[in-house]
């Protein structure tokens, strides 16, 4: 009788070990995925900052051209 109990216990311990092993593998995969996503976020953040700067520069250029155009139109009206 005690041998059967021992076998059941051994089986449950083995199942627990297998489950722990699978969970450890899953944790490693998730860590790798997390690292990859972190790198993607950093790259996207850098791209965002670059686009914000470019957008600001383009807005400034647009204002300069608008001012030039207004000045030119003003001169044309004078003539």
Curated annotation (Swiss-Prot):
Pfam families: ZapB. InterPro entries: Cell_div_ZapB. Its main location: cytoplasm. It is found in: Cytoplasm. Residues 4-78 form a coiled coil. It comes from the Bacteria. GO terms for biological process: division septum assembly; FtsZ-dependent cytokinesis. Keywords: Cell cycle, Cell division, Coiled coil, Cytoplasm, Septation. One of its GO terms (cellular component) is cytoplasm. Belongs to the ZapB family. Non-essential, abundant cell division factor that is required for proper Z-ring formation. It is recruited early to the divisome by direct interaction with FtsZ, stimulating Z-ring assembly and thereby promoting cell division earlier in the cell cycle. Its recruitment to the Z-ring requires functional FtsA or ZipA. This is Cell division protein ZapB. It comes from Serratia proteamaculans (strain 568).
């Amino acid at each position: 009788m005690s041998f059967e109990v021992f076998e059941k216990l051994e089986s449950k311990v083995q199942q627990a070990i297998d489950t722990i092993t699978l969970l450890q593998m899953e944790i490693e995969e998730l860590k790798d995925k997390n690292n990859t996503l972190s790198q993607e976020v950093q790259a996207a953040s850098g791209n965002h900052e670059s686009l914000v700067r470019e957008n600001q520069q383009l807005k400034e250029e647009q204002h300069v051209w608008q001012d030039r155009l207004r000045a030119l139109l003003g001169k044309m009206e004078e003539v």
